[in-house]
């Protein structure tokens, strides 16, 4: 006994075996009178998932980015700055978090961004630079997103931020937990982390270290 519907990744070739055995129902006749799904079935990207010219599943619409940029709003207020709306304003915030003593302790001991060696968190910056995750059509070819000019521009910008000292120098040694601990402890004014249900937990951890701290999300 098998379920009527199930989730499956097209990268797993098992579905082709099941389709060949007649276990799966081809969906082409069921969607021929639709507009949106039929267009997907006929797209170039979807042709590689057919078995003998027939389709056996529809794509799942999922959220590309569930990450958020957390920052110390109390630091921004203390420095007399508004929430950044442009990349230039974002850079100005990082500079101020690094150079203008936002925690008020009279020491040069803060920096703009706390990162880890896991690069996936950078997806929060993708839209700023026009990066589209996955494979992008370039003429008659497809190009992985990390090979695009947009992604390279993002890396070049991050390299500039690193050379300016706005990113922790040893970030590549950090685990994700260490990245967060630096933010909790007030060493950095900004970090990347999960959104949704994670927000309350991150805010409470920051307030454990400093009850007057305020955290907001970009």
Q: Predicted segment positions?
A:
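Extracytoplasmic/secretory soluble proteins
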Residues: 1-218
């Amino acid at each position: 006994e098998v379920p009527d519907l199930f989730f499956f990744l097209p990268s797993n070739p098992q579905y082709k075996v099941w389709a060949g055995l007649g276990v799966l129902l081809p969906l082409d006749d069921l969607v021929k009178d639709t507009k949106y799904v039929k267009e997907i079935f006929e797209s170039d990207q979807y042709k590689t998932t057919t078995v003998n010219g027939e389709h056996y599943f529809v794509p799942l619409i999922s959220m590309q980015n569930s990450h958020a940029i957390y920052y110390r709003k109390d630091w921004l207020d203390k420095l007399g700055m508004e929430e950044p709306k442009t990349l230039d304003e974002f850079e100005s915030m990082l500079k101020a978090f690094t150079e203008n003593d936002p925690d008020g302790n009279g020491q040069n001991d803060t920096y703009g961004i706390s990162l880890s060696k896991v690069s996936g968190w950078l997806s929060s910056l993708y839209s700023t630079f026009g990066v589209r995750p996955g494979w992008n059509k370039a003429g008659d070819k497809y190009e992985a997103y990390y090979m695009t000019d947009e992604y390279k521009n993002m890396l070049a910008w991050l390299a500039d931020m690193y050379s300016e000292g706005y990113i922790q120098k040893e970030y590549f040694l950090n685990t994700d937990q260490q990245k967060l601990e630096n933010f909790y402890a007030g060493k950095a004014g900004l970090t990347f982390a999960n959104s949704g249900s994670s927000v309350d937990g991150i805010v409470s951890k920051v307030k454990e270290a400093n009850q007057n701290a305020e955290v907001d999300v970009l």
